[in-house]
Amino acid sequence: MRSMIRTAASAAAMLVTISASGAAQSDKLAADLVKDIGDLETKVVGLAKALPEAAWAWRPMAGTRSGAEVFQHIAADNYFLPVFLGVSAPEATGVKSDYKTAQAFETRKATRDEIMAELTKSFAHLKQAVLATNPAQFPDPISMFGQTYTRQQVLILTATHLHEHLGQLIAYARSNSIKPPWSD
């Protein structure tokens, strides 16, 4: 997780530079991220609905997450990463600023319906967190996992993390002969 975060954050730093006079760019970045997260939500939730219950338990090999575990991981991190931006996770999740709380949420026993509901709530929380982050503060440094990142890097990390797991879920679906709902 930490190496993925460092890699994504480094890529984000190289790809997007916002100057002090770039407030409009910052506002656009936030709007673009919310749109992207919304598109990701549609696809992730669409795959969750398309996968039959048996496929939720499927994993490509030992030591990898099952489909259900990937969905729970996404929900957990949708709550966890905004904590570093100053947006607390809903109290009922138990997710705080330490990774152990996110892991506890991620590995809790939950039914398919509970996971589906939590996915939807977690995406709403993440989009709200992006919008709650003042674009003027995007360059501000924050500490996460013992590293220093800008708020902007953390915001971009949330989207890159979701894209990574969407790709994983597409592979899981296709390995189970399930065509992603948006795919022709």
What is each model feature region?
Residues 23-31:
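Cleaved targeting-peptide boundary
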